[in-house]
Amino acid sequence: MGVRRATIVLLAAVAALLLAAPAPAALSDGIRYLRLQQNGDGGFGEPGERSDPSLTAWAVVGLKTAGSSPRRPEAAAEYLHESGDRNVTDLELRILALDALGRGTGILADRLRAKRQRSGRIGPSVNSTIWGILALRAVGRPAGKASVRYLLRAQRPSGGWAWTPNGAADSNDTAAAIQALRSAGVSRNSRAIVRGLRFLRRLQNRDGGFELARGRGSDAQSTAWAIQAFVSTRRAAGRSAFAYLARLQRRNGSYRYSRTYATTPLWVTSHVVPAVAKRAYPPK
């Protein structure tokens, strides 16, 4: 009886490990889908649409973070190199993507540093500060003590972060802020990080997915970013979150936005594959 019980316990432990690990087929299918969306000009676009600089940057960053790369990395780099920046976050994404492709980003990083204000804010918002920190850390530049302090002060009473200083906190900005703070060396056990993770956990639904804000319903991107936040703090997001993402994967490898909508598959899949790979931003 003792041997039988020990065998059952062992099998249960193995099953738990298998469920917690990212499914190799799911990850490889998602990566393959992304790689196939590269257009002739080197950029990436949604199916049947022209290349877009922002989507190209997201695809490259998603692939790199998940441990892969575009089919034609040099073409992607050239496309991004020739693309302009409509705003600060475009610049930050371009830095992340070009660095992921092995291109020099010194001039762009200097431009980004020039966007830092005396308060530590980078660009016009909390969101642009988050991605500014991630971009600078990706290329080996210091985040800047003032920027880290600004981001810590921007934490809302709920424990989350918002796009703007006085906005309503949401899961996406909170997850990204946690990853930015971790990349800047903030302890995973700091009060700010722990409060941020608790805020995220309150936005997890019974289906295992996370939602952008209370009442919005679970979606793939919010779930993926929440997983990455937990990964960055070396904590488990929980099997139910991965199971939720698995249910949204389509036969072609892409991910639905939610159970109801299957819009912008390139954009959504770019955000999901790093989470399935259990890797956080910035890409390494």
Model-predicted segments: where are they?
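An alpha-helical repeat/solenoid feature that recognizes helix-turn-helix modules
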Residues: 25-26, 43-72, 85-106, 121-146, ...
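N-terminal signal peptide c-region/cleavage motif recognized by signal peptidases
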Residues: 20-22
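Bacterial N-terminal signal peptides
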Residues: 9-18
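Bacterial N-terminal signal peptides that target proteins for export
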Residues: 1-10
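Alpha-solenoid HEAT/Armadillo-like helical repeat scaffolds in large eukaryotic proteins
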Residues: 37, 82-83, 115, 154, ...
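Alpha-helical repeat scaffolds
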Residues: 73-80, 105-113
